[in-house]
Amino acid sequence: MIAVIQRVRKASVEIADKEHASIAAGLLVLLGITHTDEELDVEWLSAKICSLRIFSDEAGKMNRSLSEINGELLVVSQFTLFASTKKGNRPSFIEAARPEQAIPLYEQFIAACEMQLNQKIKTGIFGADMQVALINDGPVTILIDSKNKQ
């Protein structure tokens, strides 16, 4: 799994020109799932994201987690994170998991985050054409790959 994590002041997802979900201050996570991902990836990545200390404390240091600032989480599936551009100019998405594998892992990831943060997680709709809007705070953008554990 690959996650692009963005610290935001606010973020929202529109589907068919209607707002589907929105958050105030917190994290926007773009989540890509590959065909080799499994439940261990879900557990490790959700725990890592939910405990990341990337929010400022009183001294201005990144020292607080999402729960410590009472922030919200918006998770959006994004298979294009596994694009390969090795050949030609059109990306290949062969490394992205097929929906029948990816959807259960996506749902497990959301459930794991809800359990760890003790809050309802806002989401996009898997496979939908979505418009994502955000105000990046910092900007702080972090890429985490569950296979590399970094």
Curated annotation (Swiss-Prot):
InterPro entries reported in the protein's UniProt record: Daa-tRNA_deacyls_DTD, DTD-like_sf
Function as written in the Swiss-Prot or TrEMBL entry: An aminoacyl-tRNA editing enzyme that deacylates mischarged D-aminoacyl-tRNAs. Also deacylates mischarged glycyl-tRNA(Ala), protecting cells against glycine mischarging by AlaRS. Acts via tRNA-based rather than protein-based catalysis; rejects L-amino acids rather than detecting D-amino acids in the active site. By recycling D-aminoacyl-tRNA to D-amino acids and free tRNA molecules, this enzyme counteracts the toxicity associated with the formation of D-aminoacyl-tRNA entities in vivo and helps enforce protein L-homochirality.
GO molecular function, one term: tRNA binding
Entry similarity comment: Belongs to the DTD family.
EC number: 3.1.1.96
Protein name: D-aminoacyl-tRNA deacylase
Summary of subunit composition and partner proteins: Homodimer.
Predominant subcellular localization, coarse grouping: cytoplasm
Enzyme class: hydrolase
Entry annotated with the keyword Hydrolase: yes
HAMAP family registered for this protein in UniProt: Deacylase_Dtd
